């Protein structure tokens, strides 16, 4: 389990834990009385299950392992894109799993082709996410911590 402050504030922290090959995230408001914003869960990346088409001797496979190292093995498939792997530690909202960055694979890539690095910073969602984060900072909608 890890708990750390999120970008830009020290009031709402992100908790991440793994149980039975799934990651779980919650937001924890740490000021005054601690409170929790329940979050999402996602299956931990398993190459054989999630990417059965991947050539294990390819550059893409090497790139995944490099990304795994840099993300401390906090990887999952993007639920909206079966060819994108995300680092679940960082998201716009601390109780969400919409990775700020990731890598994009192609099942049609030749064996020497690299992955593509991607960022998830939608301008359309930014204002809505900032409103939600502000409500979290104020403690609106949280449940008391046990």
Task: Give short role names for the model-derived ranges.
Residues 4:
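Acidic carboxylate-rich catalytic motifs and surrounding loops in phosphoryl-/glycosyl-chemistry enzymes
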Residues 7-146:
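Extracytosolic and intramembrane catalytic regions of membrane-associated proteins
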């Amino acid at each position: 389990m890890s708990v750390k402050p999120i970008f830009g504030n020290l009031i709402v922290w992100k908790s991440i834990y793994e149980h039975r090959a799934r990651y779980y995230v919650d937001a924890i408001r740490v000021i005054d009385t601690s409170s929790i914003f329940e979050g999402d869960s996602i299956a931990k990346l398993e190459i054989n299950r999630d990417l059965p088409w991947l050539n294990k001797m390819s550059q893409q496979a090497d790139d995944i392992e490099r990304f795994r190292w840099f993300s401390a093995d906090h990887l999952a498939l993007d639920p909206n894109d079966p060819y994108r792997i995300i680092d679940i530690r960082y998201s716009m909202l601390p109780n969400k799993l919409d990775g700020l960055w990731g890598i994009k694979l192609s099942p049609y890539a030749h064996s020497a082709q690299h992955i593509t690095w991607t960022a998830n910073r939608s301008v359309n969602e930014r204002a809505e996410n900032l409103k939600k984060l502000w409500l979290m900072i104020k403690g609106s909608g949280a449940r008391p911590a046990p």
